[in-house]
From Swiss-Prot:
GO terms for biological process: carbohydrate metabolic process; cell division; cell wall organization; lipid glycosylation; peptidoglycan biosynthetic process; regulation of cell shape. Keywords: Cell cycle, Cell division, Cell inner membrane, Cell membrane, Cell shape, Cell wall biogenesis/degradation, Glycosyltransferase, Membrane, Peptidoglycan synthesis, Transferase. Belongs to the glycosyltransferase 28 family. MurG subfamily. Its main location: membrane. Cell wall formation. Catalyzes the transfer of a GlcNAc subunit on undecaprenyl-pyrophosphoryl-MurNAc-pentapeptide (lipid intermediate I) to form undecaprenyl-pyrophosphoryl-MurNAc-(pentapeptide)GlcNAc (lipid intermediate II). This is UDP-N-acetylglucosamine--N-acetylmuramyl-(pentapeptide) pyrophosphoryl-undecaprenol N-acetylglucosamine transferase. GO terms for molecular function: UDP-N-acetyl-D-glucosamine:N-acetylmuramoyl-L-alanyl-D-glutamyl-meso-2,6-diaminopimelyl-D-alanyl-D-alanine-diphosphoundecaprenol 4-beta-N-acetylglucosaminlytransferase activity; undecaprenyldiphospho-muramoylpentapeptide beta-N-acetylglucosaminyltransferase activity. It is a peripheral membrane protein. The keyword Transferase applies.
Amino acid sequence: MISSAPLILLAAGGTGGHLFPAEALGVELIKRGYRVRLVTDARALKYSGLFTKDMIDVVPSETVRSRSPVALARTALLLGTGTLAAFNLMRRLKPAAVIGFGGYPTVPPLLAARLAGVPSLIHDANAVLGRANRFLSAHVKAIATSLPGVLDRDPALAGKTTTVGTPMRPAILEAAAVPYVAPETAGPLRLLVVGGSQGARVMSDIVPGAIERLEPALWSRLVLAQQVRQEDMARVRAVYDRLKINAELQPFFTDLPARLAANHLVISRSGAGTVAELAAIGRPSILVPLPGAIDQDQFANAGVLSDANAAIRIVQTAFTSDRLASEISSLAAEPTRLAAMAQAARAAGRLDAAERLADLVAKTAGL
C-alpha cells in the first residue's frame, strides 16, 4: 500500500465492544486501499488483532465516573488535554476522516477533528445512543447506527443517521458460516456462559446453582464452557466436579466466535457487540442485562433479540438459580424451539455492515 493513500482514523474506547467493530471496519478499509490508525486509550494496547502498536495513538482521556466537583474537574482537564494532543495528531497525520465507535476516549479525537476541519462521523452499536456518542452527535457530519429507529425521536439527528449494522470481525464471519444443529433429545447439550470482557460475578453466583437444580439426567448431557473470574474459579469448579459435569472454565475465551458457533445455547450479558454477534452467527441465548446503567442500554439491546423470539431476557433481580434451571430444562426438552430461536437470531443479524459503514466513511470524507 502506498503511503499517499487516504488515512482514516478509527477512534474507540479500549474495550472489546468498541474495538471489535473498529477492527472490522479497519479490515474493510484496508481492502479498499486506505490506510488506518487507531486512536484510543491505554487499555487497547493489551488487545491483539489488526492494530499493532505502531498503528495505535494513545491520547489522554477520562470516563465520567462521578458527579462530584473534583471528579468532574479532573475529567474536564484530562479531556481537554486529550483534545489538544489529538488536535496536534490531526495536524501531523492529516487524516481524510475520523470515525468514533463510542466510549469517552473518542471524545478528544472527534472534537479535535471538528476543530481541525476534518470530516467526522460516529457509529453506535447500542439500541440507545451511548453518552459519549450523544455528546458528539451534534459535532459530526454523519451518524451510523447498528439498529433502526435509534434516533427517530430526534429529528435534528435523524436526518444525518444511517442504519448499517455492526461491523463483524473476520472470525465472526467465519463462525456465521457454521449452521445451527439443534441437540438431539438424549444427546450432548452444549452450553456457553460468558460475562463480557471482564467476566461477570453474577454468572459464578447463579449458574452453578442452576446446574445443580437440573434433573440428574441432564448432568450427563451437559458440555459446559464458562467464563469465570480467577477469584471465583475454585468455588465454581467444586460444584461442577461434585456433579461430574463436563465443564471447561476459563477467565477469558480468546476463541469466542468459534465457541459461539459450537454451542447450542449461550447465557450472557447483553452488550451491543455480544447481541450483534449472537444475531450474526444465529445462536439462541438467555440474556441478563447489566443493571444500573443510566440509559439501560443492555436492557434495550437484549430486547432486540427477545422481541424477535431469539432470546430469553431476564433482568438481574429475577436471575435466580431456580429461574435459570427452569429455562434451561424447558429449552433442553424442546430442541425445535432452540432451532427456531437460532433461526430468528440469524434473521435479526446482518453480515454486510463493514461494507456499508466503509461506504458511509468514504462518502463523508468525499473520497
